[in-house]
Design a protein with these regions (language model features):
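Contiguous alpha-helical scaffold segments within structured protein domains
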Residues: 3, 21-22, 75-171
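An anion-binding catalytic pocket shared by soluble metabolic enzymes
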Residues: 17, 22-114
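A residue-level signal for beta-strand positions that form part of recognition/binding surfaces
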Residues: 12, 71, 143
């Protein structure tokens, strides 16, 4: 892996972290879920439990896939910037702060284009009718991301599982 990084074999690398927290006070998973929903109203929040993996709570600004019958939607979310100072007033749905206050680097824009191109390529395997909008700046907590929206038709809903496997994980 290290040699591949040194030889620039990767176009993009995404690092993530897992946090395991211990509580000395009893707290129910339902209470944690409700608190996460309250703290992150614009995010997809999920509480999952399986015998094999235990209980997981996640909050993500990403929507893998949504829709019904033939009309579907997904997003490309890439580029991340922490909001600071006056930027914390940013709300993409209002004009309380100018969008020019959020300045995206060339690296972030390139990363967004990379992910959007990948999603377009995936969708075109299953649909002849793919429409892309964006990228736009969206907020998730104290962060902002670049997001492109994709609307498309899925003529064969029997291919839904294959499409999900193709889309996930995105680069």
């Amino acid at each position: 892996f290290h040699s591949q990084i040194n030889e620039n074999e990767f176009s993009k690398i995404v690092l993530s972290r897992c946090s395991i927290e211990n509580s000395y006070d009893p707290i129910s998973p339902e209470d944690l879920f409700e608190r996460a929903c309250y703290l992150y109203p614009r995010m997809f929040v999920a509480l999952v439990h399986t015998e094999q993996s235990g209980t997981w709570l996640t909050a993500s600004p990403e929507i893998l896939l949504e829709g019904s019958e033939r009309h579907w939607r997904t997003i490309a979310l890439a580029g991340t910037m922490k909001l600071e100072g006056r930027q914390l007033d940013f709300d993409e749905k209002s004009e309380t702060i100018s969008k020019e206050t959020i300045r995206w680097s060339d690296k972030d824009r390139e990363e967004q284009r990379f992910v959007a191109a990948y999603i377009t390529e995936c969708l075109e395997q299953y649909s002849q009718n793919v429409a892309e909008e964006g990228p736009i700046t969206v907020r998730a907590g104290n962060l902002v991301h670049l997001r492109s929206n994709f609307d498309f038709t899925l003529p064969k809903t029997s291919e839904l599982g294959d499409l999900i496997n193709t889309l996930h994980p995105t680069p």
